[in-house]
Amino acid sequence: MTRDQNGTWEMESNENFEGYMKALDIDFATRKIAVRLTQTKVIDQDGDNFKTKTTSTFRNYDVDFTVGVEFDEYTKSLDNRHVKALVTWEGDVLVCVQKGEKENRGWKQWIEGDKLYLELTCGDQVCRQVFKKK
């Protein structure tokens, strides 16, 4: 594994995204649209500083963060909540804890070969996404 996550990544698979969105109380119509979308993720990484853009034909989401520095995140394009987020390294895995209304919320992201793996968690639901480097 590597800590270098720079690049453009295209979604290959998206397992249990609907379950994850239900745990976030996202409405039925939005879930039905979102679950059918393919996302592209662009990561601009400079050491521990990240600028991430996630795009689809429905909604886009940008988040900038520095590893080890807590920040206020507004999850506008997902569930419209404000959370306190902290991203840290666990080995070569980025781990984000998002504190707010929902318990056990966050994500893990890592690289293996030419694939980026992302696990999104809320409550007891885990969504597993795989992206391939473009």
From Swiss-Prot:
GO terms for cellular component: cytosol; nucleus. Keywords: Cytoplasm, Retinol-binding, Transport, Vitamin A. The keyword Glycoprotein does not apply. Higher expression in adult small intestine and to a much lesser extent in fetal kidney. InterPro entries: Calycin, Fatty_acid-bd, ILBP, Lipocln_cytosolic_FA-bd_dom. PROSITE patterns: FABP. It comes from the Eukaryota. The keyword rRNA-binding does not apply. It is found in: Cytoplasm. Pfam families: Lipocalin (PF00061). GO terms for biological process: epidermis development; fatty acid transport; vitamin A metabolic process. GO terms for molecular function: fatty acid binding; molecular carrier activity; retinal binding; retinoid binding; retinol binding. All-trans-retinol binds at K41, Q109. Its main location: cytoplasm. Forms a beta-barrel structure that accommodates hydrophobic ligands in its interior. PANTHER family: FATTY ACID BINDING PROTEIN. Intracellular transport of retinol. Belongs to the calycin superfamily. Fatty-acid binding protein (FABP) family. This is Retinol-binding protein 2. It comes from Homo sapiens (Human). The gene is RBP2.
